[in-house]
C-alpha cells in the first residue's frame, strides 16, 4: 500500500510541477491576419523601470524553464509627448513582425491615443499597430528617453501599448523553443537632446555582439555606384518587364545624355511557382537570352553598373519545393510551413547565400536590391530556433555580399533582426513607397523618411525611395 501511495504522490507532483508548463504553448506559425497582441506569456512581477536606467541593454535573468514568452510591465517617466514606432494594422492584413517598409512614426501626447479608433491614421494606410519596435519620449524634465526592442541569440522583444496607455515588454522565441534563463530586454538611453540620445544608444548597441552585428555608417564602405544617378524599372513598369523593354530603355538612356550610371532591374524577372522561387535564372519567356544581351550594354563611361532585385528568402513566399537548384544546395534547405527555407544550422544557411550571391555575380550583376527582408522571420516562425535562423540569413547575406565585393540595397527590412544586422551594407529603405500627385502622402512620406533616419541613419544611409521631377506636389 505504501508503494502505491508513493507512486500516486509522484504522479501528483509530476502533474503539478511538470505538466502545466507544457499547457498553453503558443503556436507562433505566421499567417496573414494573425495578430500577436497580448500573446500568451508568463507574466513577470518585477517592473522594467525606465525612470532609473542602470544599463543601456538590461537583461532578464532567472527565467523559469520551459517558458516560450515572458511579459514585463514597463514603468515610464513623466512625459510631454512622444513617438511610437510600429507598422500600421488592419483586420486580415499582415501584422508585426512583418514590418516591411512600414516602421511608421506615430505621434502622441498620451500613449492611449494610439488605441483610440479616432486616431488619424497615415493617408491611404491603416491605424497604428500597438505592437512596435521603439519608443521616443520628450520628458517633463526636458530630457529625452529612447527605448528600442532587441534580439538575443534566439529571442526577440517588442513593445505593446495597452488600452490604458501603459506599456508591456514581451520577449519570446516565436517558436517551439524555450527562452534561455537570461535574455536581453531592450536598448535604453536618456539624454538632453534627441540626436545625441539616439546616437549614444546605438553606440551601445554596436558593442553588444549578442544583440546586434552593426557598424556606424561612417565606418563602412559606400558602394560606388550609389554615388551616381541611377534608373530603376519599377516605377515605370512595375513587374511588367522583359528583355526588349530594358534594352530599349538602356539605349534611350545612353542617347539622352542624362548621366545615369547604373540600372536596377526590379521585380518581374524571377522564375517562380506560386510566388516561391524555382531558381536563380530569369523567366525564360521574358528573358530568352538570360542576362547576356543586357549585360553587353554596360560601358565604363555610360551605364557602368547593373543591379538586380531579389527577395532575402528567394521570392515573396520563400523557395519552391519544385526548384532547379543543384543537389548540394537542396541539401541546405528544409521544409517548414509550406515553404523551403535555408537551414537548419548556420553552415547550411551560409552555403545557400554563398550560392545565391555567387550565381548572380557570375551572371554579371554588380549589386543586389534584396527586398522582403522583414518577411524572412515570419517564414521561420513556429519552428525551432526561428529567430536564430532568420538572423543567420541576414548575417550570411551580408558576409557573402562583402566577400564577393558586391553592393547591397536593403528593402522592406524594418524589423529588428534586419535593422540590427547590417554589418557591411550601407543603404536601407526608410520609407514606404512614394506616391505621385498626393499632398497628404507626400507629407507622410517625408515625415516617415526623416524620422526613421534618426534610428536607421545611425548605421546606414537612408534610402527615401524616390521623388519625381514631374510631381507637381513634391517634385
Region annotations inferred by a language model:
Residues 318-351, 355-361, 398-475:
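Glycan-recognition surfaces
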Residues 294-298, 389-408:
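Alpha-helix-loop-beta-strand connector modules within alpha/beta enzyme cores
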Residues 1-26:
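Bacterial Sec-dependent N-terminal signal peptides
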Residues 26-208:
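N-terminal accessory beta-strand-rich subdomains and adjacent acidic, glycine-rich linkers
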Amino acid at each position: 500500500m505504501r508503494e502505491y501511495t508513493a507512486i500516486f504522490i509522484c504522479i501528483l507532483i509530476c502533474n503539478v510541477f511538470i505538466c502545466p508548463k507544457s499547457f498553453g504553448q503558443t503556436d507562433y506559425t505566421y499567417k496573414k491576419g494573425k495578430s500577436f497582441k497580448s500573446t500568451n506569456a508568463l507574466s513577470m512581477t518585477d517592473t522594467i523601470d525606465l525612470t532609473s536606467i542602470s544599463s543601456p541593454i538590461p537583461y532578464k535573468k532567472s527565467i523559469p524553464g520551459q517558458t516560450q514568452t515572458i511579459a514585463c510591465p514597463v514603468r515610464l517617466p513623466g512625459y510631454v509627448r512622444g513617438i511610437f514606432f510600429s507598422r500600421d494594422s488592419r483586420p486580415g492584413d499582415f501584422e508585426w513582425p512583418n514590418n516591411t517598409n512600414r516602421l511608421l512614426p506615430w505621434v502622441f501626447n498620451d500613449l492611449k491615443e494610439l488605441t483610440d479608433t479616432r486616431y488619424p491614421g497615415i493617408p491611404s494606410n491603416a491605424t497604428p499597430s500597438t505592437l512596435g519596435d521603439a519608443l521616443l519620449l520628450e520628458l517633463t524634465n526636458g530630457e529625452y528617453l529612447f527605448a528600442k526592442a532587441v534580439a538575443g541569440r534566439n529571442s526577440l522583444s517588442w513593445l505593446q501599448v495597452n488600452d490604458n496607455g501603459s506599456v508591456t515588454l514581451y520577449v519570446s522565441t516565436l517558436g517551439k523553443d524555450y527562452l534561455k534563463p537570461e535574455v536581453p530586454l531592450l536598448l535604453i538611453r536618456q539624454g538632453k537632446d534627441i540626436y545625441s540620445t539616439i546616437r549614444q544608444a546605438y553606440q551601445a548597441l554596436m558593442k553588444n555582439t549578442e544583440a546586434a552585428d552593426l557598424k556606424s555608417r561612417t565606418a563602412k564602405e559606400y558602394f560606388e555606384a550609389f554615388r551616381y544617378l541611377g534608373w530603376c524599372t519599377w516605377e515605370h513598369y512595375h513587374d511588367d518587364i522583359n528583355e526588349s523593354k530594358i534594352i530599349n530603355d538602356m539605349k534611350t538612356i545612353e542617347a539622352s545624355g542624362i548621366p545615369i550610371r547604373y540600372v536596377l532591374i526590379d521585380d518581374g524577372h524571377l522564375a517562380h511557382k506560386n510566388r516561391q522561387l524555382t531558381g536563380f535564372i530569369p523567366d525564360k519567356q521574358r528573358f530568352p537570352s538570360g542576362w547576356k544581351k543586357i549585360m553587353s550594354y554596360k560601358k565604363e563611361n555610360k551605364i557602368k553598373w547593373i543591379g538586380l532585385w531579389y527577395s532575402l528568402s528567394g521570392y515573396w513566399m520563400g523557395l519552391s519545393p519544385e526548384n532547379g537548384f543543384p543537389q548540394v544546395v537542396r541539401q541546405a534547405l528544409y521544409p517548414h510551413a509550406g515553404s523551403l527555407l535555408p537551414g537548419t544550422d548556420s553552415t547550411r544557411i551560409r552555403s545557400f547565400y554563398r550560392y545565391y550571391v555567387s550565381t548572380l555575380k557570375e551572371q554579371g550583376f554588380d549589386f543586389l536590391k534584396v527586398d522582403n527582408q522583414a518577411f524572412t522571420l515570419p517564414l521561420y516562425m513556429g519552428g525551432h530556433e526561428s529567430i536564430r535562423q532568420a538572423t543567420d540569413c541576414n548575417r550570411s547575406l551580408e558576409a557573402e555580399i562583402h566577400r564577393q565585393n558586391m553592393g547591397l540595397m536593403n528593402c522592406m527590412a524594418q524589423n529588428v533582426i534586419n535593422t540590427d544586422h547590417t554589418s557591411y551594407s550601407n543603404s536601407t529603405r526608410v520609407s514606404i513607397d512614394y506616391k505621385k500627385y498626393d499632398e497628404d502622402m507626400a507629407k507622410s512620406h517625408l515625415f516617415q523618411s526623416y524620422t526613421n533616419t534618426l534610428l536607421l541613419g545611425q548605421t546606414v544611409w537612408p534610402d527615401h525611395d524616390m521623388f519625381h521631377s514631374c510631381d507637381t506636389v513634391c517634385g
